[in-house]
């Protein structure tokens, strides 16, 4: 079934919005980290470990997402892997022990990586792998990241 021009535009716009919001959300950790260091007396090593676990989770999403898609539909995999994001962000505010923070930030990294995979895949699919739209997608991430600054 052929996708209409309006549907293509809708998918593209939603992907741009998602990346814009993703850029803003990742900035949250840059804002939260100094407060965590001060209030929880975290060492710079522990704080850097949190950022490392975010990056490791992001990398692991490339392995986890295809496995989930193989076990269930792609839409269900998106729902299952997106659920930890708001839960972990909320739990981050409760002052839990550092090892729990590592697990939560790892799950946030997996979810963030999954968002990247899905958005890139959707843009490639509806635009016929147009580099122009992929570049604009990543531009919206940067705008979302720097706009709150």
Question: Which stretches of residues belong to each language-model region?
Answer:
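Juxtamembrane helix-start elements in MFS-like secondary transporters
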Residues: 33, 37, 42-51, 134
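Intracellular juxtamembrane helix-capping segments at the cytosolic ends
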Residues: 113-127
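Residue-level signature of mid-helix packing/kink "hotspots" within the transmembrane helices
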Residues: 27, 54-63, 146
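Glycine-rich segments within core transmembrane alpha-helices of 12-TM secondary carriers
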Residues: 130-149
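Small-residue-rich segments within alpha-helical transmembrane domains of MFS-like 12-TM solute carriers
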Residues: 23, 27, 109-117, 146
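Pair of pore-lining "gating" transmembrane helices in MFS-fold secondary transporters
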Residues: 5-34, 38, 106-107
């Amino acid at each position: 079934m052929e996708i209409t021009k309006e549907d293509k535009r809708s998918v593209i716009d939603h992907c741009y919005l998602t990346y814009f919001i993703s850029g803003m959300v990742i900035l949250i950790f840059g804002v939260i980290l100094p407060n965590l260091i001060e209030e929880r007396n975290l060492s710079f090593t522990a704080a850097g470990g949190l950022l490392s676990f975010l990056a490791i989770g992001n990398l692991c999403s490339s392995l986890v997402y295809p496995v989930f898609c193989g076990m269930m539909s792609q839409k269900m995999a998106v729902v299952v892997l997106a659920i930890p994001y708001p839960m972990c962000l909320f739990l981050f505010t409760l002052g839990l022990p550092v090892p729990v923070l590592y697990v939560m930030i790892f799950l946030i990294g997996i979810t963030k990586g999954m968002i990247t995979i899905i958005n890139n895949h959707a843009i490639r699919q509806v635009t016929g792998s147009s580099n122009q739209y992929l570049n604009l997608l990543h531009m919206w991430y940067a705008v979302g990241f720097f706009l709150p600054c």
